[in-house]
Amino acid sequence: MEWLLEDLLGAKGDMGLLWGQLTHALACRHCGSSCFQSPGNLVTLFLFVVWQIQRWWQLGRLRQLHPWCSGNMVQGKELPLLHRVAFLDHLCKQKSEVEEEGEEEEEGEDEASLDPLKPCSPTKEAPTGEQATPAPPQPSCGSEGLLKAIGIPEQTVMQPVSPSRSFPIFQILTSFPVRHKIASGNRQQQRKSQLFWGLPSLHSESLEAIFLSSGGPSPLKWSVCSSVFFNKLAFLPRSNLLLPQYHSSAQFSTHGAHTMEDLEGMAPDPQLLPPPSSPSVSSLLLHLRPFPVDHKGVLSGAEAPTQSPGTSPLEVLPGYETHLETTGHKKMPQAFEPPMPPPCQSPASLSEPRKVSPEGGLAISKDFWGTVGYREKPQASESSMPVPCPPLDSLPELQRESSLEDPSRYKPQWECRENSGNLWAFESPVLDLNPELSGTSPECVPPASETPWKGMQSRENIWVPADPVSPPSLPSVPLLESLVMGPQGVLSESKALWETMGQKENLWASDSPDPVHSTPPTTLMEPHRINPGECLATSEATWKDTEHSRNSSASRSPSLALSPPPALAPELLRVRSMGVLSDSEARCGDIQKTKNSWASKHPACNLPQDLHGASPLGVLSDSQSIVGEMEQKENCVPVFPGRGSSPSSNSVSKSHVSEPIADQSNYKPDGEAVEQRKNHWATELPAPSSLSTPLPEPHIDLELVWRNVQQREVPQGPSPLAVDPLHPVPQPPTLAEAVKIERTHPGLPKGVTCPGVKAEAPLSQRWTVPELLTHPGIHAWQWSRELKLRLKKLRQSPASRAPGPSQSFCSSPILSSTIPDFWGLPSCPPQQIYPPNPCPHSSSCHPQEVQRTVPQPVQSSHCHHFQSSSQLQPQESGRAEQGSQRGEKMKGKMVSQVPSQGPCVHMEAGVDYLSPGPGEPSNSKVLVSGKRKDKASASSSAKKREHPRKPKAGDHRRGTARLGLSTVTGKNHPAQARSLVEAPVSTFPQRSQHRGQSSQHTALPQLLLPKASGPQDQPEAGRRASDILTPRHCKHCPWAHMEKYLSFPTLKASLTRGLQKVLAKCLDNHRPLPTKSSQ
């Protein structure tokens, strides 16, 4: 402690006396040394802390470690020794035993004291080493025992000074380095042990980093090439070592070799890898990177042997590496943000190894994956960064070897990694991820030859998934892995078929960048059809996987390639939903939904039909499970950090809606759902971020909900894919129909209302809509009742009735209270389920969105609608009576209008632009209610006119999206306008709608019409909503929905005629603002 006392007290005199006294005072009465249990432990720690703080303060100003380091002090000059202090000389004079004990003791003390001092920097660490050294004079049983337990009692805890290492690591320099130097000054290779504190504190319990370095190499090289092992885990697999590694180069080298020689050999490679700009971040990122690499290496079992043939840990890693894979994936998301670009590039290199990897397995698969996968990967690599490439390349080689050794053994792990990688890769590199996904999906199917490639791909994905967005989906990785493991055996025979299809698919995927997608879907469909003929179960599953991957690749370029892939995706989705939606659907429901959302992005109603026809619904049980897994992977992959999630949520909910339709009747809903997904995808693109937030919960609940919906929907698949004529616009209705089917399982008018609500729900909420419809509907209904009461009061209150912003604001509070429900969709689903509720709910969801997207008057209408809807749900008849305020006719009209105005505007704004496409008639029905509301809320002219259509499918979503997607509504206008035209639902004055709604059928068409008339009548709708407050609307809405549901077949004709009439009226009343007339 001389140095400590000197620094603290500034005493320059003889410290021997004081030092001896301290030694005795601090000595442990049991061991005679200063241990943690010694009476002077606290004093020592305190003094040391004070000294350390002072030292840090000084170092902070000096900032130069060189003055503190003396390479001559240590045998390994590469390891800078801390500033030489008198105490070191004193220690050198003492016995080696005492010195070691004292050093260890001091190290233990330093560890204890440094633990809170984790924030100190390497410079600080150096002083720590010094500090630790003085204590050595006093033997420390505690620290010695600790070091012995660590297994490096004699090793010097020294940290090479590296500016890149910003994380606080406390170097505890014992006298052993000096003594070691004295004992073996010429020793070429010397072990340096270092106790890490701070970031390494995760392992700071007793973790000691052992640096294997040759005495000759320069400190820089040592730091670069040193392999760090905690808890004497140097012998453990690299994956374990990866955690300790903090130098990008050293980190990688650690993976490569466990010995200094290996490290030296690996040093160049790590050096090649540019460490992140931030030392601490870089260490973490590098740590994570090596981990994936190590995973790959461990998984393959070749990497470790290749780099370090003597390392046996790789053999131990099978189970351990699986764990590490999970951990690594979890960690990687966090640390991969910087590495993300490099992972992108790595896919290309991985694709190359992929080719090689199958070599061990199947030549065909190698050619297929090598050719197709490689081409596919290059796309990913285009956006990928080059940094991870070298490691990835080496990893693929190792993987190849491991695959050759036992590809099936690692396949599940590879798949798991692949899944996680895909998730990550998908999020970060859209283009790169999709091709990988395409390759990945197939990989899941083929167990043998694909396994090596999968492993490589997994590694690639692991590298590619640098984006931290995927961590949420990481949980699915184990599920996907387990799923893949099961199906792999099943898909063995379908492997060839899948490879054939996969080749086409991959080729398409490789070609798929943007425009190519349109052509590949047809090709893929053909293989799919062929495969069902050959082996529907496996080939179809395989084709689904390929198609899904294709879809994911299509999702990459959502703008250009979205249309064609969706058709294939819907088919696959239908097949999956038909075949095995229960288990894999539950697991990959979210992912699959995401994937479906991507697929739904593209209008493809006919293709799904063909697929349905081609492949038996029940054939794909096993292969579907595998495909489901693949789809899950792909679905996870398609999820973009921002919009990807949103589309996924919308698509997911839709896929759930459509997938549950396992019957032939369900095929149509599937097609519609697919189209709707398409539309949703389109919608999602404009405003995915806000939607992406809610997605996670919907994904979770949606699975259960979707199952329930499927149960409901199976008997109810009325919505026909025949809606193709309405294909562009009907898609939102189709989705709404699917939801409606789910909701109207009992055959309630909510079929109509539900579609409106469905469209009304925000993108993310759509996910929840099906869930809530099926599972959360009960509590949601309770919420709806509460909201209804509130809305009733608000409606009754003059403010709520007052048209214009005041009413909209009144509605807003309700919406605000209801918004949480919308996000959770507790209240919305109940409303959706309940015929009156859906309409009210749509309006309730709608008001917020309207507030954002529609002028205040329109908002007022929406608010009124929402209030009336919420209120009417519990009191449909009561509200109908209140509706008498405006008159029964006005009520009927407004009821139709309110659903369309409130929900439709939002639906149209949030959903229609998302889900234009086949199924328009069904959706038109939904739009009828939604558009009425939309009408009321669509005070914003043509723009909102377009919106009314979209809100139908996503009104809830819009309710939520209003918060952040008010502009999305504007974006949706074009799609909405198209939807309005296609769905024979032109913007009609609310007045006209109300008039047309005198009859329920007429009201239904008008419900659809409000969407078209929404923009024109939005101001008017606002006034009407304020006047009517939707009590009558609610009453009529349920009835209108009932009529829609009951006369859904006739609804189209009624809607057509009504739309024509209303269209004429709308054209007449559009300029007069029917709101006034309706009022």
Swiss-Prot record:
Residue stretches of biased makeup (Pro residues): 336-345
InterPro entries: Spata31g1-like
Start-end of Basic and acidic residues biased regions: 398-412, 669-678
Biased composition (Acidic residues): 98-113
Basic residues bias locations: 942-951
Disordered, as annotated region: 97-145, 261-281, 297-317, 331-362, 376-412, 506-566, 637-678, 840-975
Low complexity: compositionally biased ranges: 551-562, 645-655
Domain of life assignment: Eukaryota
Known function: Dispensable for normal development and fertility.
Record protein name field: Spermatogenesis-associated protein 31G1
UniProt organism field: Homo sapiens
